[in-house]
Amino acid sequence: MNNKADSFFWNLRQFSTLVPTSRTMRLYRLGLCKPKIVHSNWNILSNFHNRMRSTDIIRYLFQDAFIFKSDVGFQTKGISTLTARRIERLLYARRLFFDSKQSLVPVDKSDDGLKKVNLNHEVSNEDVLTKETKPNRISSRKLSQECNSLSDVLDAFSKAPTFPSSNYFTAMWTIAKRLSDGQKRFEKRLMFSHPAFNQLCEHMMREAKIMQYKYLLFSLYSMVKLGIPQNTILVQTLLRVTQERINECDETCLSVLSAVLEAMEPCKNVHVLQMGFRILVDQQVWKIEDVFTLQVVMKCIGKDAPIALKRKLEMKALRELDRFSVLNSQHMFEVLAAMNHRSLTLLDECSKVVLDNIHGCPLRIMINILQSCKDLQYHNLDLFKGLADYVAATFDIWKFRKVLFILILFENLGFRPVGLMDLFMKRIVEDPESLNMKNILPTLHTYSSLNHVYKCQNKEQFLEVMASALTGYLHTISSENLLHAVYSFCLMNYFPLAPFNQLLQKDVISELLTSDDMKNVYKLHMLDTCLKLDDTVYLKDIALSLPQLPRELPPSHPNAKVAEVLSSLLGGEGHFSKDVHLPHNYHIDFEIRMDTNRNQVLPLSDVDTTSATDIQRVAVLCVSRSAYCLGSSHPRGFLAMKMRHLNAMGFRVILVNNWEMDKLEMEDAVTFLKTKIYSVEALPVAAVNVQST
C-alpha cells in the first residue's frame, strides 16, 4: 500500500511540474472534462524532453487515478468536483481541441500493461490523451446512413458523444426527410421523450459559441425543421449566438442562414437576425460567386427590404446572367416574386431560356413560374403560349387534375389557351367519370370566367356533362358552392333545371342571405337578372326577394377624352348622356340615341316626340384591359354577360378600349368612333357633319 501511495505521489509531482498554473481543468455537470486555455504560448514539449531524458517510460498519469479536490498545481475557483472514486478510464468522453503548440505526445502501450510516451512521434494537431478512450468523430452523413430512426441517433449520442453536437441534429433531420408524415410524427414524439434528448440540447447550448459557424446554422435549421418549439431556451439561445457571430458568415453560411430565416416564424430575435442578414448581404453581395447562393439570398431578403438593396441584388443577378443554368432561369421567377421586385430585364431573359428548354419542364416548375408571373403582374404572351402549347402537345401524358391546375393558373392571369381548353373539354365529354366535387367547381369557374364555351362546337355536350355531374352531388354540396356553380352557368348562358330548383328554395336563399357575405347577395342579384332577361322560359315566373344592392359606382373620373370626341363628332353634349344607370344595377358610360338605320344621331330633346320603335339606343362602354382575355379582344365572362343583357334591354353595345383611345390623336379618335357609331352607308354624311362642327 505504501509503495502504491509513493508511486502515485511521485507521478503527481511529475504532473505538477509539467502543467503550469495557468491551465485549469473544468469539470462539467455531465461528467465531461474540458480544458480552459488561459495562455496559449506555453509549450509542453519545451522542457519535457530534458525532464524525461533519464528515463524512457513514465506511468500513465491517469491510470487507476482518483478524482479529488486539491489545491496543488490547479486553479480551483469555480470548478465543480466529484466525490473520490476509482476510475478505470478517462472521463474525457469527447474530443478536446488544443492548438498545435499544446498538443500532448502520443502514448504507446508496453508489454507490462503500462503506457509509455513515444518521444520521437510527430506532434499532433489535437490533444489526444489516449486512443483507446477517445470516441471517433462521426459525421452527420455517416450517422444518417447507419441509423434508421431519430432514436437511433440519440442512442449513438448517449453511448459516445462527439463534438460537434450539431451532427446529431443534422442527422436526425436527414432521417426525418426520408419518413412519411405519419412516421415523422411518431418519431418526433419518441425523440422528445428520449432520455438523451435533453442532454444533447445541453451540449448544443454549451458548444454554440465554439463550434464552427456553419455547424451552428445547420443545427439551428435542423431544430426548426424537426419541430422543436421556437420559443424554447435552446432555439432562442442559438438565435442569439447566431446574431453575435454573424460576421463569421461566408458564402456557404449565407445560403444556410437564408434557409434558417425562411423556415422560422417571426419573433424579435428572428427580426434582429433578419436585419443583420440584410446588412451583411449589402456588404458581401459583390463577393457572392455561386448563382444558387445568390438566388437563395435574394429569395430570403424579404418583400420589405430597402429598394436600394433589391436593385443591388438585381444588378448582381444581371451580371451573372451568362452563368445562369436552365434551373437558375426557371427559379428566377419565384425568387423575384419572393422579394416582390419586378425586374423586366431579368424576367424577359429568363423567359427566353425557359421557352428554349420547355421540353421536359416539370409541373412544379411551370406552376411556380405562372404563380410568380401573377404575383409580379408580369404578362409575357410568348411565355404563356409556349407553356400552353407544350402542355397541349403532351396532353395525353398529363393527368386530369394537373391540366386543370394549369388552366386555373392561366385563368388567374387572364390568359385563354384556346387549344388546351378545347382538348380539356373533349376529355371531359369523353370521360365524364373523371369529374368529382373537387374539380367541378374550378372547371366551371375557369371556363365561365374566360368565356370559352362561346361559339365552341361541343358547347352543348360539355355543359350537359357538367350539369349532370353537378346534379349527382346536389345532396352533399353546400349552399355557397351551389351558388358559385349556378353563377358560372349563368355566365355561360346555360340554366340547368335541377341545380336552379335546389338553389331557389327559400331555406337555401335564406341561408345565403344570413351569411352577411355581399358577394353572395351580388351573385343572387345576377341570378335574378338572368332569370328575367335571358331565355329561361321555365324559370321566368320565379321571383326572388333580395335586399337592395348599392348602385354600381361609375368611374371617379369618366373618360374625358371619349366625352370630348363624342361632343366633337355628334355636335355637342346634347346628343349623348353620361354615367347612365340602368335597371338590374347596370351602368353604362355614355348613351346615344339614333334612328334604326344608324344614319342619324337624335338630340335628347327630340327623343320624347319620337316613337320608341324608331329609336336605336347605343351604349358606349369604356373598358380596361382586364375586361378582355390577355392579348386578345375576346371579352371575359362578366363583360360578355353584360353585353348580352344590354342587348336584351334594347341596346347596341360599342366597346371603347381605354388604353387604345389614350394613344390616338384627336382626329384619329374621332374617325375611330365614327366608324363604330354610324352604319357604312351613313359614314359620308357623318363626315360632312363632323366637318361642319
Curated annotation (Swiss-Prot):
The alphabetized UniProt keywords are: Mitochondrion, Mitochondrion nucleoid, Phosphoprotein, Ribosome biogenesis, RNA-binding, rRNA-binding, Transit peptide
Which compartments does it reside in? Mitochondrion matrix; Mitochondrion matrix, Mitochondrion nucleoid
- Keyword Flavoprotein present in the record's keywords: the answer is no
Q: Which PROSITE patterns match?
A: RAP (PS51286)
Q: Which residues carry this modification: Phosphoserine?
A: 110, 124, 692
Which InterPro entries does the UniProt record give?
A: FAST_2, FAST_kinase, FAST_Leu-rich, RAP
Source species, domain of life: Eukaryota
Q: Which GO terms describe its molecular function?
A: rRNA binding
Q: Name one GO biological process term.
A: mitochondrial RNA processing
One GO cellular component, as annotated? mitochondrial nucleoid
Report the coiled-coil segments: none
Principal subcellular localization: mitochondrion
Residue ranges constituting the RAP domain according to the UniProt record? 618-675
Which family does the record assign? Belongs to the FAST kinase family.
Job of this protein: Plays an important role in assembly of the mitochondrial large ribosomal subunit. As a component of a functional protein-RNA module, consisting of RCC1L, NGRN, RPUSD3, RPUSD4, TRUB2, FASTKD2 and 16S mitochondrial ribosomal RNA (16S mt-rRNA), controls 16S mt-rRNA abundance and is required for intra-mitochondrial translation. May play a role in mitochondrial apoptosis.
The subunit structure is: Monomer. Found in a complex with GRSF1, DDX28, DHX30 and FASTKD5. Associates with the 16S mitochondrial rRNA (16S mt-rRNA). Forms a regulatory protein-RNA complex, consisting of RCC1L, NGRN, RPUSD3, RPUSD4, TRUB2, FASTKD2 and 16S mt-rRNA.
Name the UniProt record assigns to this protein: FAST kinase domain-containing protein 2, mitochondrial
**Where is the organism placed in the taxonomic lineage, from the top?**
Eukaryota, Metazoa, Chordata, Craniata, Vertebrata
Task: Give the gene symbol.
Answer: FASTKD2
